[in-house]
């Protein structure tokens, strides 16, 4: 959701941004600008009528006080009132159309975002860690997990259908160890406050963070109760402060949560059909920050380093890329992806996205802070995975396997077993 003043004053620049993002309905900006202008004209008209009604109402009072006949002037007041209601109805209709269009617009891109059409145009920023070499052909994580009896995909499919799995024995312990390890690092070393949040949220929450209305078909919804299974803890964590005004001295606020995440993966038919990479339910530790606009770039960098620190402690090789204009999410202004090396799959795989939304989500969710001069301003929101646990699990199996099928648990996790 964009600032209306920005839309009217930067129409051509906004169209260019939409084109870079691959947004096809660029002409909608001209329509939006026309609606904004009509709203302003209607508002001026209704303000003048209210002013007229106030003057006439005072005159009615004066005539009544002097004992005069108010029949004619009262009829005039009634007509003005009816005209005001008529224009207010038009105003409401225009406002609803404006909001619906604005909710479908993507965020403004940061100048640092490279131009591009797809994931192939993303730009590598740097690589960390040495890619391991093996004296044998490394196996993919799903083969390793099944051989160790740590992962049972067959029973997952039996329970829930495709893209499901179950963990067993030390395999289940590894999942729990990763969750506790990540939360401990983020709370004890990085200064985040741990929060437990629901796995079901209302439509207002999904709208504030940008999942609704545009991407409604991508998520699981419980129609009877008008609730939605969360695709990420970003949704409940960000909405903790929806419709609230935060005192300036409380910023920045940094929160983290471990949750299950649920995604339909409707557009991924045929992609990563085996293993833990693309499933309908997975575990993730999420990071969310609320900060002042002038601090958001620095806080974004900090969050990226926090997500990277988990991989450094686990000694997993990875790289950081910046997403191009055609691959970045509609809600984000700038996003860095962290991709971990997967020897068994012989490729890098996304394990975290760290995004700065600027005031995009805050405007949708009315998340503000009161500055020292008493003014209410929109915060900036930042979020990232810290990390996706299933993919981290898969990376450990592939990077720390040996020739006889054993997996060596990273040193930092051993105390959690």
Curated annotation (Swiss-Prot):
Pathway: Aminoacyl-tRNA biosynthesis; selenocysteinyl-tRNA(Sec) biosynthesis; L-seryl-tRNA(Sec) from L-serine and tRNA(Sec): step 1/1. Keywords: Aminoacyl-tRNA synthetase, ATP-binding, Cytoplasm, Ligase, Nucleotide-binding, Protein biosynthesis. InterPro entries: aa-tRNA-synt_IIb, aa-tRNA-synth_II, aa-tRNA-synth_II/BPL/LPL, Ser-tRNA-ligase_type_1, Ser-tRNA-synth_1_N, SerRS_1_N_sf, SerRS_core, tRNA-bd_arm. One of its GO terms (cellular component) is cytoplasm. It comes from the Bacteria. Its EC number is 6.1.1.11. L-serine binds at residues 232-234, 286, 385. It holds the Pfam family Seryl_tRNA_N. ATP binds at residues 263-265, 279, 350-353. One of its GO terms (molecular function) is ATP binding. It catalyses: tRNA(Ser) + L-serine + ATP = L-seryl-tRNA(Ser) + AMP + diphosphate + H(+); tRNA(Sec) + L-serine + ATP = L-seryl-tRNA(Sec) + AMP + diphosphate + H(+). One of its GO terms (biological process) is seryl-tRNA aminoacylation. It is found in: Cytoplasm. It is an enzyme of class 6 (ligase). CDD domains: SerRS_core. Belongs to the class-II aminoacyl-tRNA synthetase family. Type-1 seryl-tRNA synthetase subfamily. Consists of two distinct domains, a catalytic core and a N-terminal extension that is involved in tRNA binding. Homodimer. The tRNA molecule binds across the dimer. HAMAP family: Ser_tRNA_synth_type1. Catalyzes the attachment of serine to tRNA(Ser). Is also able to aminoacylate tRNA(Sec) with serine, to form the misacylated tRNA L-seryl-tRNA(Sec), which will be further converted into selenocysteinyl-tRNA(Sec). This is Serine--tRNA ligase. It comes from Leptospira borgpetersenii serovar Hardjo-bovis (strain JB197). The lineage of its organism: Bacteria, Pseudomonadati, Spirochaetota, Spirochaetia, Leptospirales. The gene is serS.
């Amino acid at each position: 959701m964009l600032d209306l003043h920005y839309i009217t004053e930067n129409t051509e620049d906004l169209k260019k941004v939409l084109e870079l993002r691959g947004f096809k309905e660029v002409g909608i900006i001209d329509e939006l600008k026309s609606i904004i202008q009509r709203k302003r004209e209607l508002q001026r008209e209704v303000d003048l009528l209210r002013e007229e009604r106030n003057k006439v109402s005072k005159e009615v009072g004066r005539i009544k006080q002097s004992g005069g006949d108010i029949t004619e002037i009262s009829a005039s007041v009634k007509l003005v009132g009816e005209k005001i209601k008529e224009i207010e109805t038009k105003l409401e209709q225009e406002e609803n159309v404006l909001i619906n269009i604005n909710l479908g617009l993507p965020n403004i891109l940061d100048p640092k975002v490279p131009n591009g059409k797809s994931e192939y145009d993303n730009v590598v920023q740097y690589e960390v860690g040495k890619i391991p070499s093996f004296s044998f052909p490394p196996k993919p994580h799903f083969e390793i997990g099944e051989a160790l009896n740590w992962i049972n995909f067959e029973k997952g499919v039996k329970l829930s259908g495709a893209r499901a799995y179950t963990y067993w024995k030390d395999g289940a312990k590894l999942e729990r160890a990763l969750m506790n390890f990540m939360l401990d690092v983020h709370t004890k070393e990085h200064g985040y406050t741990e929060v437990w949040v629901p796995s079901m949220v209302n439509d207002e929450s999904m709208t504030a963070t940008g999942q609704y209305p545009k991407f409604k078909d991508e998520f699981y919804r419980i129609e009877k109760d008008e609730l939605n299974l969360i695709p990420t803890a970003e949704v409940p964590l960000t909405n903790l402060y929806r419709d609230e005004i935060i005192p300036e001295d409380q910023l920045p606020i940094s929160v983290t949560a471990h949750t299950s995440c649920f995604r339909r993966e409707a557009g991924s038919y045929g992609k990563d059909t085996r293993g833990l990479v693309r499933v309908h339910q997975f575990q993730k530790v999420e990071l969310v920050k609320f900060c002042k606009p002038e601090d958001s770039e620095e806080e974004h960098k900090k969050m990226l380093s926090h997500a990277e620190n988990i991989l450094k402690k686990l000694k997993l090789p990875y790289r950081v890329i910046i997403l191009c204009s055609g691959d970045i999410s509609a809600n984000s202004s700038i996003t860095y992806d962290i991709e971990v090396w997967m020897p068994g799959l012989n490729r890098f795989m996304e394990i975290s996205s760290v995004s700065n939304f600027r005031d995009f989500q805050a405007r949708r969710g009315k998340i503000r802070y009161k500055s020292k001069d008493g003014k209410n301003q929109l915060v900036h929101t930042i979020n990232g995975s810290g990390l996706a646990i299933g993919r981290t699990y898969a990376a450990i199996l592939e990077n720390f396997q040996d020739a006889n099928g054993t997996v060596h648990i990273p040193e930092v996790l051993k105390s959690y077993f």
